Amino acid sequence: MDNIYERFGVRPIINASGPATRLSGAIMAPEVADAMREASQWCVDIDQLQGAACAIIARHTGAEAGYVTSGAAAGLLLSTAACVTGLDPTKMNRLPDTKGMRNRVVMARSHRNFYDHAVRSVGIELVEVGIADRYSGAGVRDAEPWEYAAAIDDNTAAIFYVAYAHTQPDLVSVVEVAHAAG
């Protein structure tokens, strides 16, 4: 079967992992491809489009807002930048120079992964909590809520939390710590 990738000399693979960017993401449903094809025929104001997308994402997820990005790394970079700068365009224009801004992001050591490069590229200081290996035996464990709380100070902009199948502590506990810190 001849396809666009074979014409470029790229060998197709079988992706049994799911929507992983490094494996091409997910195969789009025909309705999605049709909508993209239709959208490509028009020019629109991107701010207005993002506003409409935000409303749709919020309505369907129950979140306060939403933002469409090109992938997970872009989403992490933009959300970290938003936590550091707020709505201040002067601060936005200074990035990755975060001097004088709330520029610390707290993260469990066991949550470290290649996506934290996107977070660090904003110019933040990554503050690690917990012990990285929770499977080795006595005295070795994952982060505890109190460790997140102890790491938060006046320069903390965010907590970077990665949800895995067995992530500890649970997200609700970390959110409670963040809200208690203000």
Which sequence ranges carry the predicted segments?
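A structural motif shared across PLP-dependent enzymes of the aminotransferase-like
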Residues: 21-33, 43-52
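Conserved PLP-enzyme active-site core in the AAT-like
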Residues: 2-23, 27, 54-68, 73-182
